[in-house]
Amino acid sequence: MIAFHISPVLKVGVRAGPSYVLALMAISVMGIVTGLHSGCLPPPVDSGRDTPPASDADRSIAQNSVKMLAEGRETFRFDTFGSESFWGDALKLHQALAGSANGGVGPGVTPNQALQLGLKVDSDMLIPAVIESLQSGTLNLDDPLTTLDLLRADAVVGVKGFFDQNRTITSIGIQCALCHSTVDDAVLPGIGRRLDGWGNRDLNVGAIIAIAPDLSALANVLQVTQDTVRAVVNAWGPGKFDAELTLDGKGFRPDNRTAATLIPPAFGLAGVNLHTWTGWGSVTHWNAFVSNLEMHGHGTFFDPRLNDPVRFPVAVRAGLHDVRSNPDLITPKLAALHFYQLAIAAPAPADGTFVREAARRGESLFAGKAGCARCHVPPLFTEPGWNMHTPDEIGIDSFQADRSPDGRYRTSPLKGLWTHQKGGFYHDGRFPTLRAVIDHYDGHFDLSLSEAEKDDLVQYLLSL
Ligand code: HEC
Ligand code: HEC
């Protein structure tokens, strides 16, 4: 699949579409299957057994895993699920990005402003000449036209621009990668190669929504004014989003702080039973939920728990417990999307980013005196089984738990914690540092941890 070069400034690289990726990956699996183990599948890690030759059934499973991975990655990175009908056609967000000089409205959004909003640029989509001009500072990052060029090159992570033949932007849709990928900053801060699964804690989703010219779609469903919608989303801040707003209409907590929650990572989730901060369901439940109800894609979603006028009045008004679309742009993609997400392991911290000796002592505390491993069971770091706890058990208020069907908080899987220290910890970032989390547990569970022990625990958490 080749994306054509339209812009004189930025060229779209050859995008490795499904068939290309598939072919490459199939070759690499065949390499393992036929080359390394002479006709055998790779043996299980600890197996002392002789591996028998691969059967047709074994081979077909291995080939399916390659296909699922490639398709799922394509969906995670590039599928909008038809969400352009909401972000473009209804909210007209593309017009605000373009600005009046380019067929839109207002001043437009420059690349520098987009980077300030936490949007990321995928350098694999840019030709070397553009990367050089970025590094030498000669590419104009203060012109909304360059933003449009980047969108045309499919280089803005998680955002897809649609253009007509006159190169005018006509709509815009969003992808999973918007919130759950970032980049490695290899070219410049905010510009580099993709890191799938990392929560984008720089992304100011609320500020992006707030610049949309027409928020009537949200205002109508929430039964408030557009100004109120703007005030609610402007209060979210970087790294946060409120997936429950369009279910219960609650924009703020009782203490008047935003009701939004942090964007969690979407890696290290294999083996974890329930997902999201409040354990709404499995990974695939949430994938269907978010693509239909939050991204405003067009698919099928069924969850009768939402048909609860007391807890979810907005969802009931909008009929969100039983969504059907024709054509269904989501359901056929859910299996591979699930598979891809489970394949994303939590990234290991680099050497030297934590103190190894202290981490080793912290590990003993985690399993022993501090009692953490009772809930954060290694190596999943959540409970195998029903990984949910009442607000009282962990010593916090019930506001966010009450916005979900189970009324509980899910034990966060802790691997890769080092990647998401920005924005704080716990669902709403209430603890600014890991040390603050440990202080909370020290008080709540009466642990009598010494200062040195707390430091060791922090080092252990940073090593996961
Ligand atoms: C606008 C930002 C945004 C987009 C787009 C988005 N998510 Fe999320 N995602 C979130 C937030 C916020 C949460 C936490 C929700 C909660 O607890 O209420 C979350 C939670 C999750 C979780 C649970 C993680 C865990 O720790 O259990 C998964 C899995 C996930 N999202 C996958 C996806 C997939 C797949 C897509 C695309 C179909 C997607 N998300 C699109 C913001 C987003
Ligand atoms: C009773 C079960 C339980 C015990 C014991 C427990 N935790 Fe937790 N932990 C949770 C739950 C539930 C959450 C999610 C809270 C939230 O998001 O509001 C959590 C969240 C966390 C987080 C934040 C993760 C994130 O992504 O923001 C850290 C860090 C953490 N726990 C570390 C520890 C440490 C260290 C200990 C031992 C001192 C410990 N926990 C003991 C249940 C537990």
Regions found by a protein language model. Give the residues of each.
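Periplasmic c-type cytochrome electron-transfer domains
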Residues: 2-11, 19-21, 28-464
